[in-house]
Amino acid sequence: MSVIINYDKLLKRIRHKYAIPIAAARRAEGLKDFGRPKLDPQMVKQAGDKINIALKELEEGRIVIRNEEMLKILVPKVK
């Protein structure tokens, strides 16, 4: 069974849609290298791979982006 990721919840937590995959990828790398999931073991077992674990952690607010000022470069300039 896989974990369902609610993209609307992710967008409420992280305002910039382009930051979601970047943050999830960096967290998944951290989990692969040295990190421990911040989810309960049953959820980790259901999620399976590192990217799903990272997305679920973001959705639940268990990890946050420290420097949101950096994310301003992701916002397109519309004329």
From Swiss-Prot:
Keywords linked to the UniProt accession: DNA-directed RNA polymerase, Nucleotidyltransferase, Transcription, Transferase
GO biological process: DNA-templated transcription
Superkingdom per UniProt: Bacteria
EC number, UniProt record: 2.7.7.6
Catalytic activity: RNA(n) + a ribonucleoside 5'-triphosphate = RNA(n+1) + diphosphate
Signal peptide: none
Subunit structure: The RNAP catalytic core consists of 2 alpha, 1 beta, 1 beta' and 1 omega subunit. When a sigma factor is associated with the core the holoenzyme is formed, which can initiate transcription.
Protein name: DNA-directed RNA polymerase subunit omega
Source species of the chain: Kosmotoga olearia (strain ATCC BAA-1733 / DSM 21960 / TBF 19.5.1)
